Amino acid sequence: MTKIITHLLNPLAVIIPILLAVAFLTLIERKVLGYMQLRKGPNIVGPYGLLQPLADGLKLFIKEPVRPSTSSPLLFITTPMLALTMALTLWLPLPLPHPMTNLNLGMLFILAISSLTVYSILGSGWASNLKYALIGALRAVAQTISYEVSLGLILLAMIIFAGGFTLTTFNTSQETIWLLTPGWPLAAMWYISTLAETNRAPFDLTEGESELVSGFNVEYAGGPFALFFLAEYANILLMNTLSTILFMGAMHNPITPELTSINLMIKASALSMLFLWVRASYPRFRYDQLMHLVWKNFLPITLAMILWHTSLPIFTGSLPPQT
């Protein structure tokens, strides 16, 4: 009985804070964009608009989930659930400061599951049976698959630095120096690729309002739309937490080791705020520019960096112990 309770409570203890963080990330986004455009943002519901996410969530979940008569019913309903399930599953191997499941190949697991999220987007666009939704879904799939190539190669270079696929290994390897310092070109490309991977501005071509109405989720309303929304923002938080663990020495703080989780949260929040800053500052890329960036610029540079980061430690005999 105790085991059952533990297996129920442990995932809940991770899922509920993630969903709460997602809710308030939407509020921060609206506030930040508001102040950057010289306006207030939401400030009616609750003090300083703090209850706005709760009001939004309540409104979305009590709305009738309208389904177009031409859509494929089963696929149309299952894809939003699949999207959120995948987004929450990705948090399992992250050390926050202790992972839910300490996988030997944590990085590989994250890459595999993040590749599967493509199916939820493709399924939703396909099931809607609408040209705008399908074009948005195809754009999203092409974009996600393209940028996953550069993400995977950057990860490979960082694994050579750290000496293992386990995320806790990254914390140990950054006790003396952040990997951001020796690998700053990789870190810059990683951050831009995470923007593209999560379909955020300036790479939000999947939901280009001017040409695609709203992209792959154009036919979704109420609860299913809210699930897509939660999945998108959970992925943003996940990517920034992962960036923190990989490049910014997430845990190590020799003076106050008990503040490791707060340390991680502050860094991940700062990176998330940078996402919002980028959204407020840059216009949308053209589709050919988006593809040119990853295949003609990022891919050759990343391959060159992998060769450099592999050959130099072998030449100088300074490869880290492989775990």
Swiss-Prot record:
Its EC number is 7.1.1.2. The chain crosses the membrane at residues 8-28, 74-94, 105-125, 150-170, 176-196, 227-247, 258-278, 298-318. The keyword Translocase applies. GO terms for cellular component: mitochondrial inner membrane. GO terms for biological process: aerobic respiration. Keywords: Electron transport, Membrane, Mitochondrion, Mitochondrion inner membrane, NAD, Respiratory chain, Translocase, Transmembrane, Transmembrane helix, Transport, Ubiquinone. PROSITE patterns: COMPLEX1_ND1_1, COMPLEX1_ND1_2. It is found in: Mitochondrion inner membrane. It is a multi-pass membrane protein. Its main location: mitochondrion. GO terms for molecular function: NADH dehydrogenase (ubiquinone) activity. Coiled coil: none annotated. It catalyses: a ubiquinone + NADH + 5 H(+)(in) = a ubiquinol + NAD(+) + 4 H(+)(out). Belongs to the complex I subunit 1 family. Core subunit of the mitochondrial membrane respiratory chain NADH dehydrogenase (Complex I) that is believed to belong to the minimal assembly required for catalysis. Complex I functions in the transfer of electrons from NADH to the respiratory chain. The immediate electron acceptor for the enzyme is believed to be ubiquinone. This is NADH-ubiquinone oxidoreductase chain 1. It comes from Latimeria chalumnae. The lineage of its organism: Eukaryota, Metazoa, Chordata, Craniata, Vertebrata.
